[in-house]
Amino acid sequence: GHSSYALEDVTARYIFGKKLEGAEAVDALVKIFQEYLRVKEQDTLYKNLELPVAKVLAQMEFNGIEPDMELLDQLAEDMSFRIKKLEKTAIEQAGEDFNLKSPKQLGVVLFEHLGLPVIKKTKTGYSTDVKVLEELEGKHPLISTILEHRKLAKLQSTYIDGLKPLQNPKTGRIHTRFQQTVTVTGRLSSADPNMQNIPTRTEEGKQIRKVFVPGEGYDYLMSCDYSQVELRILACIAKDEVMLEGFKNDQDVHARTAAEVFGVPLEEVTAQMRSRAKAVNFGIVYGISDFGLSQQIKVSRSEAAGYIENYFARYTGVKQYMDGIVELARKQGYVTTLLGRRRYLPEIMHSNFNLRSFAERTAINTPIQGTAADIMKNAMVK
């Protein structure tokens, strides 16, 4: 099929009238794809960035990372105890026995027996997804218990029970797979396990991070990252003077945005203002709507629209960039990153509003997110 990357399927799609197998098929495909890359002006990116990065990733996969299995066992025991305790509490709060993992049973308990307001229905009954539960939080103590139970159960299945079988019996290490060709923006992803998405904000997440330790002969694990890389890229490609000035003066970018959006001096910015400005900053990068922002920061749609309007009034360069890049995408059918990676947007001229809007948001975001990936990969090679 068209979505399959198995050698026989790719060969069938690109080589007509010949039955080629194994190395012969690979050799023929290489010639076809090299020409395809040249025509699309992607050959330099491929040779100078993606191939060298592949070697770095191979070495990283080979090296792996060492887990402290004793700590993992200890966390597993603690997590199981806490989950069982929450299950007992939930049954007491509900006043009846039910399976917390069954959305159907939970729906009956919440909306029929406890009489909580129905937020959303699905084909099979009441919706009990996270958004629904968060909206109901505060209306009954059971809701908070269910949310905590779900959080811990996910951590348990993904990171505690999930990590044990992934330890290599020969090396004693966990060897994740880095995926270089999965995301359309050029970003790397990771699987088995996903080492790029281990939670850090919660206390439980921090404990899981402690499971990964320096191997024998090493004293510490080193972590490197770019500070606010996507917002810095936005400031640069949009040539926005206000945002550039903030970065040049090493200001807290979210506090600076709060001062601009709320019209207060920097020193008078509150924690709530900064939090909302942070949502605006990252939301703008992803082309967020007033409705999307209102849902995220729990304010009215008109208030969210006011924040976005104030943002564009102060950061005029960002607004000009967004309008300009969408127009460019309409003209040429694609957008590019700093190092020339292309993302084609066939839906940018679509008559369907939702498809067209998604393509427009993609046109805005790809040069930012993709350039961040280019910079990160370049640093890895160097």
Predicted regions and their residues:
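Conserved "right-hand" nucleotidyltransferase catalytic core of DNA-directed polymerases
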Residues: 2-6, 10-14, 22-203, 213, ...
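Flexible glycine/proline-rich, aromatic-decorated loop/lid segments
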Residues: 200-205, 251-255, 350-352
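Conserved catalytic core of nucleic-acid polymerases
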Residues: 62, 168-171, 175-176, 181-183, ...
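Ordered, soluble secondary-structure elements with a strong preference for glycine-centered loop motifs
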Residues: 1, 228, 366-370
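Conserved, non-catalytic sequence blocks in retroelement Pol enzymes and Pol-derived host proteins
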Residues: 100, 246-248, 368
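A small-molecule sensor/coupling module
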Residues: 237
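Conserved catalytic alpha/beta cores of large enzymes that bind or transform nucleotide phosphates
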Residues: 209-234, 245-278
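Short amphipathic beta-strand starts and helix->beta connectors
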Residues: 203-208, 380-382
